[in-house]
């Protein structure tokens, strides 16, 4: 098949690029190590990806919060339509993706010369972390938009797995009645090694913060077990 090239962008990310180079199936790694990419501001990352992506047939990123932020901008810069959140590849131009909050699966075909795609990572098996020996090429191009600047971030720490990658998810809704009752799920989740999610109703009621919301207006999950 065609070669797979991977872009690693960030600040002080050279070690990550070297680690990615050992992944099976990777032919080349581009390393864009610059403070401009340190906080993944969409304006900066999208310009970088579009500049590199114009020479490729497919530009792919995970359908994470970050990917959903910058990839539509990449598609706009390349003047193509994005194919979002795919769960299967039928051919080089045809893909399957969920629609209507996962109640139906659409098969979509892209006629664009460059396919800009976001992938639901939990729908695909991970490649082996070792077995490859890709070359690493440093990217000197710096895209640093004057229209945005990083102000700060608030990181929520948790020993539980991330919702979007968890194999087991236990979720609560309006029936939990209040935030104190919602905490009853903690013990079950700890026993199962599960992530905890919540419905929009529970979030709107103030039982839990909105980063726990799952579904069409929240985080997309694909666990092996959903309770």
Describe each model-derived feature in a short phrase.
Residues 1-226:
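N-terminal glycine-rich FAD/FM-binding segment characteristic of electron-transfer flavoproteins
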């Amino acid at each position: 098949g065609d070669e797979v090239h991977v872009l690693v962008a960030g600040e002080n990310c050279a070690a990550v690029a070297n680690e990615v180079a050992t992944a099976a199936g990777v032919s080349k790694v581009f390393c864009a190590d610059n403070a401009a990419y340190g906080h993944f501001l969409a304006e900066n990352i999208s310009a970088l990806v579009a500049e590199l992506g114009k020479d490729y047939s497919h530009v792919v990123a995970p359908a994470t919060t970050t990917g959903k932020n910058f990839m539509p901008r990449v598609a706009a810069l390349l003047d193509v339509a994005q194919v979002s959140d795919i769960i299967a590849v039928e051919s080089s131009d045809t893909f399957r993706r969920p629609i209507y909050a996962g109640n139906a699966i659409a098969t979509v075909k892209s006629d664009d010369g460059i396919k800009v795609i976001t992938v639901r990572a939990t729908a695909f098996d991970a490649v082996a972390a070792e077995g490859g020996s890709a070359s690493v090429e440093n990217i000197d191009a710096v895209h640093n938009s004057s229209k945005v600047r990083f102000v700060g971030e608030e990181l929520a720490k948790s020993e539980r797995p991330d919702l979007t990658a968890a194999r087991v998810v236990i979720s609560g809704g309006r029936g939990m009645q209040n935030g104190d009752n919602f905490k009853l799920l903690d013990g079950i989740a700890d026993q199962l090694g599960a992530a905890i999610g919540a419905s929009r109703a529970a979030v709107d009621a103030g039982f839990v913060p909105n980063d726990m919301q799952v579904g069409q207006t929240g985080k997309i999950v694909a666990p092996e077990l959903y309770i």
